[in-house]
């Protein structure tokens, strides 16, 4: 079990079966699903969907391919999920994605969670480049990434399907040399062997 924390209002912890009900309760919202991408995020979202995702995340982590975390408040309440995918060890890059339950929006939890994940990616995984793709309508997420030092690298026309229409995506990236966060962030329980580190 990995835990990533600081003195922030949230901490990250590896997903576990006990998170299923909280994930389902927070994910079962059309606006949350739309922000993630409805082509691979079901709506409605039930406990069985959460269980399937936790199982998938556990397998991908064991194979050293992805790392997904619950975003928890200091009292343990799970408010969202974020993770690393498209992990390219040879080129030391990945893509991140995240969502927060709607009732927890606009509290800074997403920002702090991404800060924790950046430290994990750049230091624990020795990545050089971290990317995020944000749908064109998601101005809040764009602002979050820009505020953390990500740079926009361009618009991807008709990036994702939404019903019979297509949504543009915007690519954001941060390079390790531009990473400036000096907060004291602790990573407990991580085994770098799982991710092919030397």
Q: Which stretches of residues belong to each language-model region?
A:
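Hydrophobic residues in alpha-helical segments
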Residues: 27, 36, 61-62
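A short helix-loop-beta-strand connector motif used in the catalytic cores of GNAT acetyltransferases and
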Residues: 55-70
């Amino acid at each position: 079990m990995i835990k990533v924390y600081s003195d922030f209002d949230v901490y990250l912890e590896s997903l576990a079966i006990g998170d299923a009900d909280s994930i389902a309760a927070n994910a079962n919202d059309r606006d949350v699903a739309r922000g993630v991408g409805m082509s691979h995020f079901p709506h409605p979202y039930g406990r069985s969907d959460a269980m399937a995702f936790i199982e998938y995340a556990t397998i991908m982590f064991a194979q050293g391919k992805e790392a997904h975390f619950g975003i928890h408040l200091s009292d343990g309440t799970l408010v969202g999920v974020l993770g690393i995918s498209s992990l390219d060890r040879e080129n030391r890059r990945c893509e991140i994605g995240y969502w927060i339950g709607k009732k927890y929006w606009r509290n800074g939890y997403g920002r702090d969670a991404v800060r924790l994940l950046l430290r994990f990616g750049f230091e624990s995984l020795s990545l050089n480049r971290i990317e995020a793709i944000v749908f064109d309508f998601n101005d809040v997420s764009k602002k979050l990434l820009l505020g953390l030092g990500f740079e926009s690298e361009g618009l991807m026309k008709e990036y994702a399907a939404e019903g019979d229409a297509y949504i543009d995506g915007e690519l954001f990236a941060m390079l390790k040399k531009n990473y400036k966060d000096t907060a004291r962030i602790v990573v407990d329980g991580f085994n770098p062997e799982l991710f092919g580190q030397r």
